[in-house]
């Protein structure tokens, strides 16, 4: 066997030691630190996965809490808005029933007086000059004739109230 020859044996042994030593040095300086870093990183990732699982549970719990809080705030906002609208409707009904009742009554009375005065104007115009009123077809003549008839006393009072403003009650 030529490999185990005395002449080549020494050189082969030297080269074998050189290659093993360089391999050992390279592995010791470069390989082992990289391997140890990888092992440490894996340990850290495994521990973080355990903590991450706990954190993911915390995140799920936070999402549930946020969802409940948002629903509660939306419900509160809806109830406050609906309560405010109910209060406004109640105040309007109260104002119409008590405070504005006189004004509403005066308004209805004035509407009635206006309609009655229109009927009276037509009747008065037809009795005063039936031939002129019935034969005249021009709208302008009818309007001027109706406007010449005087206004009822109730309408005069209403107009006076509007012009002068509401009367203040005297305290006795």
UniProtKB/Swiss-Prot annotation:
GO terms for cellular component: mitochondrial membrane; proton-transporting ATP synthase complex. Its EC number is 7.1.2.2. It comes from the Eukaryota. F-type ATPases have 2 components, CF(1) - the catalytic core - and CF(0) - the membrane proton channel. CF(1) has five subunits: alpha(3), beta(3), gamma(1), delta(1), epsilon(1). CF(0) has three main subunits: a, b and c. It is found in: Mitochondrion membrane. GO terms for biological process: ATP biosynthetic process; proton transmembrane transport. PANTHER family: ATP SYNTHASE PROTEIN YMF19. GO terms for molecular function: ATP binding. It catalyses: ATP + H2O + 4 H(+)(in) = ADP + phosphate + 5 H(+)(out). InterPro entries: YMF19-like, YMF19-like_N. The chain crosses the membrane at residues 13-29. It comes from Marchantia polymorpha. Keywords: ATP synthesis, ATP-binding, CF(0), Hydrogen ion transport, Ion transport, Membrane, Mitochondrion, Nucleotide-binding, Translocase, Transmembrane, Transmembrane helix, Transport. Belongs to the ATPase protein YMF19 family. It is a single-pass membrane protein. This is one of the chains of the nonenzymatic component (CF(0) subunit) of the mitochondrial ATPase complex. It is an enzyme of class 7 (translocase). Its main location: mitochondrion. This is Putative ATP synthase protein YMF19. The lineage of its organism: Eukaryota, Viridiplantae, Streptophyta, Embryophyta, Marchantiophyta.
């Amino acid at each position: 066997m030529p490999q185990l020859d005395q002449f080549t044996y020494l050189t082969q042994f030297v080269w074998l030691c050189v290659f093993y030593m360089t391999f050992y040095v390279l592995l010791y300086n470069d390989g082992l630190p990289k391997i140890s870093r990888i092992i440490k990183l894996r340990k850290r990732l495994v521990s973080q996965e355990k903590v991450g699982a706990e954190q993911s549970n915390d995140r799920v719990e936070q999402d549930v809490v946020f969802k409940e809080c948002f629903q509660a705030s939306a419900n509160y906002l809806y109830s406050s808005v609906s309560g405010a609208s109910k209060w406004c409707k109640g105040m309007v009904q109260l104002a119409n029933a008590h405070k504005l009742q006189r004004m509403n009554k005066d308004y209805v009375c004035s509407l009635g007086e206006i309609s009655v005065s229109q009927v009276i104007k037509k009747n008065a115009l037809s009795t005063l000059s039936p031939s002129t009123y019935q034969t005249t077809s021009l709208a302008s003549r009818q309007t001027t004739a109706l406007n010449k008839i005087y206004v009822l006393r109730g309408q005069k009072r209403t107009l006076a109230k509007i012009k002068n403003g509401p009367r203040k009650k005297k305290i006795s």
